[in-house]
Amino acid sequence: MITIVDYDCGNVNAIINAFKELGVNAEVSKSINDIDNASKLILPGVGSYDYAMKRLFKSGLIDSLNNSVLKKKIPILGICVGMQILGNKSDEG
């Protein structure tokens, strides 16, 4: 299942609507279990790098995302600031 990670910092509705238009099944989730069991992940984001990182850490999903992507090699697509936070650091505030 494609899982769109909801960490309260993204354009989740736009993404799910695009998948519906394409006839692709995807779920929106804040659940560690769903992230751990996803076949692919989408990490949306709107706003600044710092704000997105704060929301991601506050969500409690960072360890699950790291495990899924870095250890299990689950493909991830970052959109907008969701792509930026896949990096180690940013000069953006």
Predicted feature residues:
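N-terminal beta1-alpha1 ligand-phosphate binding loop
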Residues: I2-V24
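Short alpha-helical
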Residues: G10, N33, G47
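Residues at the C-terminal ends
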Residues: E21, N37, L70-K71
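Short gly/ser/thr-rich secondary-structure transition/capping motifs
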Residues: E21-V28, S59-G60
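Structural signature of beta-strand start/N-cap positions in the alpha/beta core
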Residues: N25, K40, P75-L77
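Short acidic low-complexity segments
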Residues: A26-N37
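Short acidic/histidine-rich motifs immediately flanking catalytic phosphotransfer sites
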Residues: I35-G45
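Cysteine-nucleophile active-site neighborhood
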Residues: G47-G93
